């Protein structure tokens, strides 16, 4: 099974950045790819998603989410709830193993296959194998520096890559 992803989203004021590392790991010991892109812009560039979990599953869910965004006119929360409901109820989708972070100019959401759509209390959220490390680093940087969201997200992933063996420092960042 493919694994090993770290995604972090950081919001400050009217800016949000979502960053992901580039490592794809097969099993527990083989790195297959160093430069995978796990961050995508959807809905005419107005929404950023980052995904963690099985690569094929994450891509499938990202495509489904894009369909929901189109169906609901770019309404992030509505599209997320509809995706989560379909994900939980559909016999095939229910078996997919992935998490999504989705962000637009107003909201940041975590979407899971168990039907949860969570808006974090803090303006930072992390997922994947190094997600907790990246989230902790991003929170510290957000509250103790004047760095912008892109710099915070990038530095948080750099820190996570020094701790988590499934995370590398080939980082992609998208900002709204």
From Swiss-Prot:
Its EC number is 3.4.25.2. One of its GO terms (cellular component) is HslUV protease complex. It catalyses: ATP-dependent cleavage of peptide bonds with broad specificity. GO terms for molecular function: metal ion binding; threonine-type endopeptidase activity. InterPro entries: ATP-dep_Prtase_HsIV_su, Ntn_hydrolases_N, Proteasome_sua/b, Proteasome_suB-type. Keywords: Allosteric enzyme, Cytoplasm, Hydrolase, Metal-binding, Protease, Sodium, Threonine protease. It is found in: Cytoplasm. It holds the Pfam family Proteasome. Na(+) binds at residues 161, 164, 167. Allosterically activated by HslU binding. One of its GO terms (biological process) is proteolysis involved in protein catabolic process. It is an enzyme of class 3 (hydrolase). The active site is at 5. Protease subunit of a proteasome-like degradation complex believed to be a general protein degrading machinery. Belongs to the peptidase T1B family. HslV subfamily. A double ring-shaped homohexamer of HslV is capped on each side by a ring-shaped HslU homohexamer. The assembly of the HslU/HslV complex is dependent on binding of ATP. This is ATP-dependent protease subunit HslV.
């Amino acid at each position: 099974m493919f694994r090993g992803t770290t995604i972090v989203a950081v919001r400050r004021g009217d800016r949000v950045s979502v960053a992901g590392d580039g490592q794809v790991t097969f099993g527990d010991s083989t790195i297959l790819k160093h430069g995978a892109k796990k961050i995508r812009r959807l809905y005419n560039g107005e929404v950023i998603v980052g995904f963690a979990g099985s690569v094929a599953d994450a891509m499938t869910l990202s495509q489904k989410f894009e369909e929901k965004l189109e169906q609901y006119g770019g309404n992030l929360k509505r599209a997320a709830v509809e995706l989560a409901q379909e994900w939980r109820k559909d016999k095939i989708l229910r078996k997919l193993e992935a998490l999504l972070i989705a962000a637009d100019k107003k909201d940041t959401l975590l979407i899971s296959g168990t039907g949860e759509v969570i808006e974090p209390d803090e303006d930072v959220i992390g997922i994947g194998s190094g997600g907790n490390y990246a989230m902790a680093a991003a929170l510290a940087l957000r509250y103790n520096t004047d760095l912008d969201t892109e710099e915070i997200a990038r530095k948080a992933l750099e820190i996570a890559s020094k701790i988590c063996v499934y995370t590398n420092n080939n980082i992609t960042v998208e900002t709204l």
